[in-house]
Amino acid sequence: APHRGKVGLLFQDPDDQLIGPTVLEDVEFGPLNLGWDAHRAHHAADDALDQVGLLHLSERPVHELSGGEKRLVALAGLLAMKPTVLLLDEPTVSLDNDTTERIIEILLASKLSMLIATHDPLCIDRLATRSVLLDRGAITDQSESVHQV
């Protein structure tokens, strides 16, 4: 699989994505599963947790995290694998304004290509360079943004 590890998928519900007992073990799982050695995976996990502002929670059990923290840990798990493309399913759904802003800022800073499925106008406005509006599976509108991401 030549594209293995190149595309990161963020699920709408982070509970469907998080599998490690602790935050660090969860974020290390992806790189280890790609065949990275333990030292490289640990370093990548620490870097990714630092990127999302949760390095201080690395030893916390995943089940003790808030919904926003779980979403950030799931995103860190993707970033640790150094993907070139992110597929994001409702990345800001059910988050408070501060966590939504953090997610958007992290995604902007990543400079990665993204395909985003969302109902959040703020997410579209801040992240999309091109948007396609679907209604019952049919394209009803398309637009390109004037800002650079």
Predicted segment positions?
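Conserved ABC ATPase signature
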Residues: 61-65, 69
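Hydrophobic anchor residue at the start of the ABC signature
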Residues: 75
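Conserved ABC ATPase "signature" region
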Residues: 39-57
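Catalytic Walker B motif of ABC-type/P-loop ATPase nucleotide-binding domains
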Residues: 86-89
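Short loop immediately C-terminal to the Walker-B catalytic DE motif
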Residues: 92-93
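H-loop/switch region of ABC-family ATPase nucleotide-binding domains
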Residues: 118-119
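A short, surface-exposed alpha-helical micro-motif characterized by mixed small hydrophobic
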Residues: 124-126
